[in-house]
Amino acid sequence: MLGLRNIILLSPPPTQITRPSLPPVNFAAVEDNNTVGEKVCRDCGNRAKKECLFERCRTCCKSRGYNCVTHVKSTWIPSSATRSSSSPSERKKKLKIDKQSSPNVSLLPTTTSRQERGFREGLPGKIEAPAVFKRTRVTAISNNEQAEIGYQATVTISGHIFKGFLHYYGVDHNKAFPCLSQK
Amino acid sequence: MGMVGLRDVFLVAPAYHHQNAGVISGSDHMNSNAAAAAALGVGVIPLLTAGTPQQNVEDSDINFLGNNRRWQNNNNNHETQYLHFKSTNQTTVGTSSNNSGSGSGASGTATCQDCGNQAKKECKQRRCRTCCKSRGFDCSTHVKSTWVSAARRRERQVMPTGANPTAGSSLSTSSGTKKPRIVGSQQQQQQQATSHTSTSNTPPQSFETSSSRQDGGGSREAWPGQVRAAAVFKCVRVTAVEDGDDEYAYQAVVKIGGHVFKGFLYDQGLEPKEGFPSMSDLHLGGSANNHNGVSASAPILDPPNVVYGGGGGSGGGFYS
């Protein structure tokens, strides 16, 4: 027990020496074989690529609607398909988001996309603003499911552009919301 | 030989998951885990399980123990939800190999419909934690808990590994082939993925349907391709996994074509000058002066709702 504790106490100083420039000292997994300083996704904690400017994994880049240069649409195969190697035809499954949902506004990815403190305090809690809703098609991983219709919304609030996907929730039985398409 | 290695990697992850859930316990599984770990260089999992009772003094381990307790509580909920899932959806028959061996556990793994990660069988939406959060589903399985991120888990695993010379030698032997270790690390990451989104309003009960599929192709064509209209956006706080700064996003609930769409709008950065018309700038300028952001027309969402409230608010927030 004492030996284990001594060994544990000796390991933190090398990581601090390895990363002197990062303000939040993260004791990430440092291995001699791997490259030092692996990134983790800021939303879900999964491992993110170093080239991603938004510091997020593929899933969170997709869900946030970022036009990430690194996580471009490709012939990516989910890990469950590679795990089930019994049938090779299942490797054709792909994560599909229709390319027609790309916005007209070409936003340049910025490394400092975080919101500053003064900007956050000035954000209104509730706002009614004109927005653009574009229909998009979200395809599930397995090809058995039909494509699902969603809407991509883009709005400008306090000089910032907010963008995201609105997913289908069901029929409005109680008529709680006014219909936007009838306006 | 490589295929055998891949299969051994497959066997490790569900056994680890079951051990955390408290379903499978025995020396045979420990031996099999140790053998697979020695073969592939993933010698961290048994060390973590073995080292847990010795490190009760540290705060992070206490969180881990709390996480174990929470999982045990969730395990009871999972069983009832699984029965409920079977009773509601009889058309989509899921695999009924929950408590069987690790081999069939790997074959019967439910995958997330959005990203392909490994999803829990008890989740009605058949999605992982990350996609349930991003889609705004009020999933009772993926409830906010004292979850520890994969990076911190790997951080704890590496400390005894770096000190252990035998584990170092196994890592050096596995350095020749990168694919098995990457797959192993991905399996560890898939089971621990979440994003803490604290929204003040939960969707009403009438929208929580186990089968959220859309109608046939005919009604889908009735939905317009593009709509320019004013909608109400509610500010929500999105918390990062680490203790970094929070970020604010906007939640929108709109009705298009008689159906309700809901989602989160994230900050993309400053607006380009040539991007949007000046009408929105003038409107936003007027709204920015008013700190409450109450518009002239009657708002769709109720004003007395707490904007920055925690998760699990009242269900009637969307009714006016």
Curated annotation (Swiss-Prot), chain A:
<feature type="compositionally biased region" description="Low complexity">
    <location>
        <begin position="79"/>
        <end position="88"/>
    </location>
</feature>
<keyword id="KW-0217">Developmental protein</keyword>
<dbReference type="InterPro" id="IPR006511">
    <property type="entry name" value="SHI_C"/>
</dbReference>
<dbReference type="Pfam" id="PF05142">
    <property type="entry name" value="DUF702"/>
</dbReference>
<comment type="function">
    <text>Transcription activator that binds DNA on 5'-ACTCTAC-3' and promotes auxin homeostasis-regulating gene expression (e.g. YUC genes), as well as genes affecting stamen development, cell expansion and timing of flowering. Synergistically with other SHI-related proteins, regulates gynoecium, stamen and leaf development in a dose-dependent manner, controlling apical-basal patterning. Promotes style and stigma formation, and influences vascular development during gynoecium development. May also have a role in the formation and/or maintenance of the shoot apical meristem (SAM).</text>
</comment>
<dbReference type="GO" id="GO:0009851">
    <property type="term" value="P:auxin biosynthetic process"/>
</dbReference>
<feature type="binding site">
    <location>
        <position position="44"/>
    </location>
    <ligand>
        <name>Zn(2+) 1</name>
    </ligand>
</feature>
<keyword id="KW-0073">Auxin biosynthesis</keyword>
<keyword id="KW-0238">DNA-binding</keyword>
<feature type="binding site">
    <location>
        <position position="68"/>
    </location>
    <ligand>
        <name>Zn(2+) 2</name>
    </ligand>
</feature>
<feature type="region of interest" description="Disordered">
    <location>
        <begin position="79"/>
        <end position="121"/>
    </location>
</feature>
<keyword id="KW-0927">Auxin signaling pathway</keyword>
<feature type="short sequence motif" description="Required for homo- and heterodimerization">
    <location>
        <begin position="157"/>
        <end position="160"/>
    </location>
</feature>
<feature type="binding site">
    <location>
        <position position="52"/>
    </location>
    <ligand>
        <name>Zn(2+) 1</name>
    </ligand>
</feature>
<feature type="compositionally biased region" description="Polar residues">
    <location>
        <begin position="100"/>
        <end position="113"/>
    </location>
</feature>
<keyword id="KW-0539">Nucleus</keyword>
<keyword id="KW-0010">Activator</keyword>
<dbReference type="GO" id="GO:0005634">
    <property type="term" value="C:nucleus"/>
</dbReference>
<feature type="binding site">
    <location>
        <position position="61"/>
    </location>
    <ligand>
        <name>Zn(2+) 2</name>
    </ligand>
</feature>
<dbReference type="GO" id="GO:0046872">
    <property type="term" value="F:metal ion binding"/>
</dbReference>
<protein>
    <recommendedName>
        <fullName>Protein SHI RELATED SEQUENCE 6</fullName>
    </recommendedName>
</protein>
<feature type="DNA-binding region" description="Zn(2)-C6 fungal-type; degenerate">
    <location>
        <begin position="41"/>
        <end position="68"/>
    </location>
</feature>
From Swiss-Prot, chain B:
<comment type="subunit">
    <text>Homodimer.</text>
</comment>
<feature type="binding site">
    <location>
        <position position="115"/>
    </location>
    <ligand>
        <name>Zn(2+) 1</name>
    </ligand>
</feature>
<keyword id="KW-0238">DNA-binding</keyword>
<protein>
    <recommendedName>
        <fullName>Protein LATERAL ROOT PRIMORDIUM 1</fullName>
    </recommendedName>
</protein>
<dbReference type="Pfam" id="PF05142">
    <property type="entry name" value="DUF702"/>
</dbReference>
<dbReference type="GO" id="GO:0009851">
    <property type="term" value="P:auxin biosynthetic process"/>
</dbReference>
<dbReference type="GO" id="GO:0042803">
    <property type="term" value="F:protein homodimerization activity"/>
</dbReference>
<keyword id="KW-0217">Developmental protein</keyword>
<feature type="compositionally biased region" description="Low complexity">
    <location>
        <begin position="168"/>
        <end position="177"/>
    </location>
</feature>
<dbReference type="GO" id="GO:0009733">
    <property type="term" value="P:response to auxin"/>
</dbReference>
<dbReference type="GO" id="GO:0003700">
    <property type="term" value="F:DNA-binding transcription factor activity"/>
</dbReference>
<feature type="binding site">
    <location>
        <position position="128"/>
    </location>
    <ligand>
        <name>Zn(2+) 2</name>
    </ligand>
</feature>
<dbReference type="GO" id="GO:0048653">
    <property type="term" value="P:anther development"/>
</dbReference>
<dbReference type="GO" id="GO:0005634">
    <property type="term" value="C:nucleus"/>
</dbReference>
<feature type="compositionally biased region" description="Polar residues">
    <location>
        <begin position="193"/>
        <end position="214"/>
    </location>
</feature>
<feature type="short sequence motif" description="Required for homo- and heterodimerization">
    <location>
        <begin position="256"/>
        <end position="259"/>
    </location>
</feature>
<keyword id="KW-0479">Metal-binding</keyword>
<feature type="region of interest" description="Disordered">
    <location>
        <begin position="150"/>
        <end position="223"/>
    </location>
</feature>
<feature type="binding site">
    <location>
        <position position="132"/>
    </location>
    <ligand>
        <name>Zn(2+) 2</name>
    </ligand>
</feature>
<dbReference type="InterPro" id="IPR006510">
    <property type="entry name" value="Znf_LRP1"/>
</dbReference>
<dbReference type="InterPro" id="IPR006511">
    <property type="entry name" value="SHI_C"/>
</dbReference>
<dbReference type="GO" id="GO:0048364">
    <property type="term" value="P:root development"/>
</dbReference>
